[in-house]
Amino acid sequence: MTAMMAQTKDLELVIRHVLAGLGHGIHAGRERGAGVEFSEYRAYAPGDEWRRVDWKLLARADRYFVREAERDSHVATWLWLDATASMAEPSREINGIDKLWFARTVLACVAAIAQRQGDAFGLVICTDGKVEFTQASRGPRQLQRVLAALSKAKPEGSLPPADVLKANLHFARAPSMIFAASDFLDWPSPLSEALLRLRNMRHDVRLLTLRTQAEVDATFKSGSGYRDPERDEGLHRMSNADREIYRQRSRAHFEMVTGSCRQNNIVHYEARIEQPLSGVLRSWLRLAGARAK
């Protein structure tokens, strides 16, 4: 199914497929919605979820009513996409998908959820040494702007310098939720430092680390030449003897990423781009929701 979704250029179509059956949102906002704390009833309207219908009241009143709730807080949602050259790494198991495709599709789904909840949401893209913004706003038109920017993103160059990122953190002055998707091959890095700084500014930071199964298992072809796409260091040929060293270093690196996130109370979820996208999205949101309780 992931391979089929990768063939379409219609990001909205992919979003509809992924979000079908996803039964929860990003957070609790102040506008009325299907929250936990019961507030009042209102008449059923087309598009309401059937699980919110009060069937006992239907039996008494012979009309459909849905339960509403007053949600707790209202914060902006920011999507942060790493669109540097390393995100072009493709799956060796599923044709047509790479890290960037997976990252932008997951973030597009988060944007769609935010739009459904009535939240303001914006987009930050790190690519080719610069930062690109889509300012936070609400509504269907904003969703179209964000989807267009995500669709145009190409995996190019390296991360912006630390001073450039630091100078651009003004976008999140008010308390915000920040959903960042990257391979986090560099940590510490200008990106990780910016995200940690945002967390220290009391923003709710939630990270998604994307890897390929080949990266995890080190199932690279022996003798083939590999080049770091973000550094000009020539070709590296991985022998069989190099594999175990690679695995150890890779394991240590991502354990460091996980430990740093835990130490700073940052939600962190690691996924393979070969996994079903809907399952990754659901797990990431549930992990974030569990911390919020």
Regions found by a protein language model. Name each.
Residues 35-38, 52:
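A residue-level signal for beta-strand positions that form part of recognition/binding surfaces
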